[in-house]
A protein has these predicted regions:
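A short hydrophobic beta-strand segment most commonly corresponding to one strand
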Residues: 65, 87, 100-116
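Short histidine-centered beta-strand/loop micro-motifs
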Residues: 45-46, 55-60, 77-78, 96-98
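Short acidic-glycine-tyrosine-enriched beta hairpin
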Residues: 74-94
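Conserved hydrophobic/aromatic beta-strand scaffold that supports enzyme active sites
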Residues: 30-32, 44-48, 65, 85-87, ...
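Exposed loop/turn and edge beta-strand positions of beta-sandwich/beta-sheet ligand-binding modules
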Residues: 27, 43, 62, 67, ...
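A short, N-terminal "cap"/entry segment at the start of jelly-roll beta-barrel domains
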Residues: 1-39, 106-149
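Glycine- and acidic-residue-biased ligand/ion/polar-headgroup-sensing regions
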Residues: 50-53, 60-75, 152
Length: 152
């Protein structure tokens, strides 16, 4: 499957207009924003976990990073409330779910293969003083990339 896979082209997506698509796990639905591949894919997706839903244990060969948009995301490494940025590099594994339900914005298979930096952080705590009405936080920076978050 290829969806918005030509990264030389500008794409604007109204996520509220996208239908929720069921994942292979009951209670876990997604809105696909970009995708190259089938179930294991380079992808950017909004994922919704119904209360009490879980995904089976799996590894992230290409890494995973996500932002918890609402609710509390959980796995064996911790509980991550809304506003948390989580970075799981290649080779990490977990069993994700949510007792109360949650929605996350997730990017898969977009890491450098040598990246092994795993962490999570509260995005709001990282925000600097606003400039021209915009506050920005650097969530991750290394020789390969810089990940930022801006709040209006």
């Amino acid at each position: 499957m290829e969806l918005n896979a030509d990264f030389s082209q500008k794409v604007v997506v109204d996520t509220d207009s996208l239908e929720w698509q069921p994942s292979p796990m009951k209670g876990v639905d997604r809105r696909m924003l970009d995708r190259i591949g089938d179930e294991v894919a380079r992808a950017t997706t909004i994922v919704r976990y119904a209360p009490g839903s879980k995904f089976s244990a799996h590894s992230h060969g290409g890494g995973e990073e996500f932002i918890v948009l609402d609710g509390v995301f959980q796995d064996e490494h911790g509980d991550y409330p809304a506003g948390t940025y989580v970075r799981n590099p290649p080779t990490t594994s977990h069993t994700p779910g949510s007792d109360a339900g949650c929605t996350i914005f997730v990017k898969l298979w977009q890491f450098d293969t040598d990246d092994r930096t795993q962490f999570h952080k509260d995005m709001e705590a990282e925000l600097g003083a606003p400039e021209n009405g915009v506050a920005t936080a650097i969530l991750h920076r290394d020789m390969r990339e810089t990940v930022t978050f801006s709040s209006l």
